[in-house]
């Protein structure tokens, strides 16, 4: 759901030019998205179990690999977004990424089909198991690299390409709504049907279904290529930011001026408000817009070196990015705690009683579907119930930062409940009666509620505060933060494993509950840091045509 803003009009009909772009592209885009979503979630949700059962990798090491993969899945979309914006356009990037993903999932299917591509399975009751060879790991990592790169290349690009097919903001918003619903539908299908197939039929069939979904989505997308509007690469949005920094450094000895006419302004862009004097914050950057004899052409008075002279608007755009950086840092610990909890929950589920009756056994990798369902339900409740009631009582709307704060509180509460549940589970281990897997559901429901508050609100903050030229990048900033968080969760688990005895390979002999309490303490400190940042933060003034619907779920 990263980078998406839900339209309040869930039943809006998508209109547009049915000859090139518009409504004729809708079934191709949505079908492609559904297939890619089924594929991506189908292999990643159960990755820890696959590594443990098929590669004889220890549980904590498997969790570490899973966190690294999830980190790449969250961070690489920004790289592909820059490639699409700067060089190739969205349509070629999606085509190439879908094909790369197909190669990766096909290789995973081969691994699960041929025994010589993976170590021999552990014998029943045996403690010593064959470790994977360099060849086994090489093939595995190649498959993971391909499918990760391919999946990442379609996430942001499909959202942008789909929205670009329409001209009206209402139609774009409606497409984003369908995008969100389709991604989560694919995730739920994978977390239930695909994961169940992997654990109860075979890994080969499970990965084979993912490969089939990927192949169909690739064919569907290519089939509709002649109907798409092809966006032209517009250059990297980061170039302007870099130029401001370079220009400010080159003029570091220049004395700033208090006269408006001494600063270079960008008056030709009608979409922007004409800014006179640069703001007082981050004053050292103001030199980038300060005119000097070296910066201007003597004949026409125009700037002849954009790396020495930037406009006041460009300087203010850079400042707006710097202002939200402290808020962005606050996301990192939230994502870290979620990453640790996701990994530990799978390991906990593997040592609980997952049988709901004599025949059905809940797959460990399917538990994360609870987070998705909880998040979706509360996104709707927030939009139609909670936010309107709050507005009626207080005559004010919850700001995005207030929503982020509420989400962080739910996140802390979820970690505390996870600690309590794990302490109870360890007591049942002593009594030799495995705890029911259903005890793991309440903290997952609560973390999903937290996601419904803070994730989309963070997207709204960055979308509103970033420069107009970086709005597409702004929608992926939250995803980048969570990508880094997965790497941090890997580092945190590694640190705890090295310095304590809380995380042995058999968590029945460890203290995972203490790990959760560490996350609670860190969450409280992070919440305090966020409150301080929010107190001093002021929202950027956005033109009316860029403001969001007051009934939008991110308000």
Curated annotation (Swiss-Prot):
The keyword ATP-binding does not apply. The gene is NPF2.1. Expressed in roots. SUPFAM superfamilies: MFS general substrate transporter (SSF103473). GO terms for biological process: nitrate assimilation. It is found in: Membrane. It is a multi-pass membrane protein. This is Protein NRT1/ PTR FAMILY 2.1. The chain crosses the membrane at residues 32-52, 68-88, 91-111, 127-147, 175-195, 205-225, 324-344, 369-389, 401-421, 437-457, 476-496, 517-537. Transporter involved in a passive nitrate efflux. The keyword Electron transport does not apply. It comes from Arabidopsis thaliana. One of its GO terms (cellular component) is membrane. Keywords: Membrane, Nitrate assimilation, Transmembrane, Transmembrane helix, Transport. One of its GO terms (molecular function) is transmembrane transporter activity. It holds the Pfam family PTR2. Belongs to the major facilitator superfamily. Proton-dependent oligopeptide transporter (POT/PTR) (TC 2.A.17) family. Its main location: membrane.
């Amino acid at each position: 759901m990263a980078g998406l803003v839900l339209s309040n009009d869930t039943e809006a009909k998508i209109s547009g030019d049915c000859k090139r772009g518009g409504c004729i592209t809708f079934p191709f885009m949505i079908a492609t998205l559904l297939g890619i979503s089924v594929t991506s979630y189908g292999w990643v949700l159960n990755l820890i179990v696959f590594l443990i059962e098929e590669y004889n990798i220890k549980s904590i090491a498997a969790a570490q690999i899973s966190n690294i993969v999830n980190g790449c899945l969250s961070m690489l979309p920004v790289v592909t977004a820059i490639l699409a914006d700067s060089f190739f356009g969205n349509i070629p990037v999606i085509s190439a990424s879908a094909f790369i993903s197909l190669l990766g999932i096909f290789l995973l299917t081969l691994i699960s089909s041929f025994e010589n591509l993976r170590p021999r399975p552990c014998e029943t009751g045996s403690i010593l198991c064959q470790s994977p060879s360099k060849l086994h790991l090489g093939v595995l990592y190649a498959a993971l690299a391909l499918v990760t790169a391919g999946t990442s290349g379609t996430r942001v690009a499909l959202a942008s390409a789909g929205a670009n097919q329409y001209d009206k903001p209402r139609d774009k918003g409606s497409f984003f709504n369908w995008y969100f619903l389709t991604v989560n539908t694919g995730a739920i299908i994978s977390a239930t049907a695909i994961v169940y197939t992997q654990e109860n039929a075979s890994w080969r069939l499970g990965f084979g279904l993912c490969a089939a979904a990927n192949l169909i989505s690739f064919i569907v997308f290519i089939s509709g290529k002649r109907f798409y509007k092809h966006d032209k690469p517009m250059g990297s949005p980061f170039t302007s930011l870099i130029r401001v920094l370079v220009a400010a450094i080159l003029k570091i000895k220049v004395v700033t001026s208090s006269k408006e006419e001494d600063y270079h302004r960008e008056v030709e862009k009608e979409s922007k408000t004409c800014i006179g004097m640069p703001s007082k914050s981050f004053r050292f950057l103001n030199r980038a817009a300060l005119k000097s004899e070296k910066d201007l052409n003597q004949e026409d008075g125009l700037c002849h070196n954009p790396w020495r002279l930037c406009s006041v608007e460009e300087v203010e755009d850079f400042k707006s990015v710097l202002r939200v950086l402290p808020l962005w840092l606050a996301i990192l610990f939230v994502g870290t705690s979620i990453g640790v909890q996701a990994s530990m929950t799978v390991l906990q589920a593997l040592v609980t009683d997952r049988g709901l009756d004599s025949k059905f056994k809940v797959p460990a990798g399917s538990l994360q579907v609870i987070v998705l369902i909880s998040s979706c339900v509360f996104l709707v409740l927030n939009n139609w119930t909670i936010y309107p009631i709050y507005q009626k009582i207080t005559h004010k709307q919850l700001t995005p930062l207030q929503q982020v704060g509420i989400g962080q509180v739910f996140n802390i509460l979820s970690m505390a409940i996870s600690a309590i549940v794990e302490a109870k589970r360890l007591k049942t281990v002593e009594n030799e009666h495995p705890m029911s897997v259903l005890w793991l559901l309440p903290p997952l429901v609560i973390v999903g509620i937290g996601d419904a508050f803070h994730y989309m609100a963070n997207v709204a903050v960055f979308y509103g505060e970033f420069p107009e030229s970086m709005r597409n990048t702004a929608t992926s900033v939250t995803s980048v933060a969570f990508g880094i968080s997965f790497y941090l969760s890997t580092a945190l688990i590694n640190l705890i494993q090295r310095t304590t005895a809380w995380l042995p390979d058999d968590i029945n002999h460890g203290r995972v509950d203490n790990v959760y309490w560490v996350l609670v303490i860190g969450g409280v400190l992070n919440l305090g840091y966020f409150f301080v940042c929010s107190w001093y933060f002021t929202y950027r003034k956005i033109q009316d045509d860029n403001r969001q619907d007051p009934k939008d779920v991110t308000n």
